[in-house]
Amino acid sequence: VNDHGLPDQRTVLYVHGGAWFQDPLENHFEYLDLLVDALDARVIMPVYPKIPHRDYRTTFELLTKIYKRLLTKIDEPENLVIIGDSAGGQIALAFAQMLKKEQLSQPGHIVLISPVLDATFKNPEARKYEKEDPMLGIDGSKYLVELWAGDAPLDDYKMSPMNGDLEGLGHITLTVGTKETLYPDAVKFSHMLNDKGIKHQFIPGYNLFHIYPLFPIPERQRFLEQLKKIIVTKEL
């Protein structure tokens, strides 16, 4: 979407969510249009392989091919942005860590919208928040992520990216609703980054729900304006 064919154009690689088995929803395509306007960016959203027919390995191979190709089309990796929501947020952060291991350039920014950060779902606080979350349940999510993991342990960074090497990644922006199952892990993750001295932006969606920026509510526009300040004008 919005490809000007220019090497200095900001480029977003968007990794959509969907519990590792769903293709993008209409909300995703609407959100891409908003990202184009807010960031004046070219946006690419691959429909990656999913469970039950594939696991994470096939998707990481696809994303690596796409990312390497993007690196040849832009002047500066700083102009690359990886965004992921929900399961896509998990994939986005894990993929950035894999890029580091493969000694490939980091994107300028990594934006995580209600990401799955710990696939073991062992945080006891998560059960309390689950009672208020109409969208995401722990037991069902754990069953699906086990299929996605294949033979990888659930505590491996590719499944639980908060367990990985977080140094030297692109600038992380994290948003999550305070009324969702994943909120406690997001808070824990932000504290971890602070403890490591890693600059990042943590934007809680107060009294909001899972992947709230994908829905037509006022807070969506507010988050887009914050993203623009972080990525485009660099005011935050």
Q: What residue ranges belong to the model's regions?
A:
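A short loop-to-beta-strand scaffold at the N-terminal edge of the catalytic core in hydrolase folds
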Residues: V1-N2
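Alpha/beta-hydrolase superfamily serine-hydrolase fold, recognizing
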Residues: G5-L236
